[in-house]
Amino acid sequence: QEGENFTREVKSIDKSFLKHGDVTVKVDYSCLNYKDALILNNGAKLVKEFPHIPGIDFSGTVLESESDKFKKNDEVILTGWRVGEIYYGGFSQYAKVDGNFLVKRPKNLSSKQSAILIFFPVIFSLFSKANTVSSSL
């Protein structure tokens, strides 16, 4: 970042680059949340530290944990908590986050299904807005 200008790029980083949190997760799926789109469009307004990894929502498997809430191989979901905004997010193979931000994934949902459910409120909102617009025409 230089002033108000910043660049976007995809690059390889070492896991040691991930510095926030006590649980390291192997990310299976992440979705493009509206805040991710804002960050990718004009990150200087929301992101406080560069370089940065967006990805507000993700599902995955715990690799390492210093939290008493999670252990290796626990399947987890994360949504919100300003992850992908002020903390590194899920647009990466790995994420290191505060264990308090995670929830265990329900056993009856696959990682992919849970990622779809994370995205469902966005889809619902879009359809609701589209229906409101069409009914007012």
Identify the residue ranges that each predicted region occupies.
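Compositionally biased regions
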Residues: 13, 17, 60-62, 126-129, ...
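Non-catalytic surface loops within mature trypsin-like serine protease
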Residues: 2, 17, 29, 64, ...
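Residue-level recognition of the GNAT/N-acetyltransferase active site
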Residues: 1, 19, 106
